[in-house]
């Protein structure tokens, strides 16, 4: 059983927050991660900055822009990841990254370095699972015992969901709405049934993300999803308070605690 799989061994839904590494600087991200994990995160997503984040909304796009205002360093990304892992070795860390930064480094070198830094899962929004590149990469990840986490959207066909079973591990990231990341006022109609269907077809835990921001939304989704993923709302706190580290730490801890307390 992988470290990620073990998190889902209880009946309680898992809180999975996301932060963009490098915003406003690399060192602060260690504090952000620590606050979120102490507040109740069961898994932590770490975003690798990229100049063309096609799946991300304005909040995360701005976070990447702030991070990339400084020279981008994959070496620094890996070092900060290792520091977070050292603080909380019990909490699985997952990279959410576009394919280009990995390809630029070299897939084998990246996989080895990510594993050594404490990464237990990867989400790559712009790498379809049914490509030769994905199949080759999946084999590398399997050897390193890193989970390859795939996205399912409202538009993904049932046939494609079934095909995903052979190339996915850890959990499925279910995108709750069309469009890019960002906060939404209401949840999609039929979300519960769709998540249950995906879980039955793939045989993995299903975590819901995109558009979730409030404790009430997290409470509702946690009754039928194995995990609740929140990115833009977390990153918004960092955008507004990141210049004052202690204030931001307090706000992130409070927010995480409220979300975790609301979940079933």
From Swiss-Prot:
It holds the Pfam family Trp_syntA. Tetramer of two alpha and two beta chains. GO terms for molecular function: tryptophan synthase activity. Belongs to the TrpA family. The keyword Lyase applies. The alpha subunit is responsible for the aldol cleavage of indoleglycerol phosphate to indole and glyceraldehyde 3-phosphate. Keywords: Amino-acid biosynthesis, Aromatic amino acid biosynthesis, Lyase, Tryptophan biosynthesis. SUPFAM superfamilies: Ribulose-phoshate binding barrel. This is Tryptophan synthase alpha chain. Pathway: Amino-acid biosynthesis; L-tryptophan biosynthesis; L-tryptophan from chorismate: step 5/5. InterPro entries: Aldolase_TIM, RibuloseP-bd_barrel, Trp_synthase_alpha_AS, Trp_synthase_suA. Its EC number is 4.2.1.20. The lineage of its organism: Bacteria, Pseudomonadati, Spirochaetota, Spirochaetia, Leptospirales. The active site is at 45 (proton acceptor), 56 (proton acceptor). It comes from Leptospira borgpetersenii serovar Hardjo-bovis (strain JB197).
